[in-house]
Amino acid sequence: MRDKKTSYIRLLHASPKAPAVDVYANGDNILADDLSYGEFTPYLPVMPGTYTIDIYPADNSDTPILTKELVLPEKTIATIAAIGELPELELFIVEDPKEPLQPNTSKIRFVHLSPDAPAVDVIEPNGSILFKDVSYKDITDYLSITPDTYTVEIAPTGTDNSVLFVPNIRLLPDAFYSLYAIGLVEGDPYLQLLIPLDGNSYIET
């Protein structure tokens, strides 16, 4: 049985061109082993508190590429993303807030983690704008949407110059999703969209 104060975190490697990494908390507690770019860990139960997070290149624990203190409140559900380009790697926290969800609906939000992309709009093919003028490191509010299969495009704000086209996004009912834009508009790895099921869909805190 979990402590009533337990929090849940997952890790996301969203740093373009960074190698696969190992992530440790408070010295020797491993949170992620050989986590590659674009990958998430499962949600991990952790106690609230202050943690020292060390990120190393996978299988090389000599010198961390990032050391950061992380304060985690109780009963939090969150994604901890490694973002930015080396050597300016940083940790970015995306909380999954608990909020009402009407039966047979979905909720989506957009998280802009592409370090060289401008502010963008997220658009449906019919021109309907789902999210507008979202800048780097912005997290939108959740938007209620009918469960279905969707296509979206990402374009610099106020233009129809699509930089990413993503078809066949299947949204299930009674679920929360985040659309994470990662990668680079100019360079490799190119911009892509990750669409995981958020922990607030199924984790009770």
Where are these regions (language model features)?
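Intrinsically disordered, low-complexity polar regions and short flexible loop motifs
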Residues: 1-205
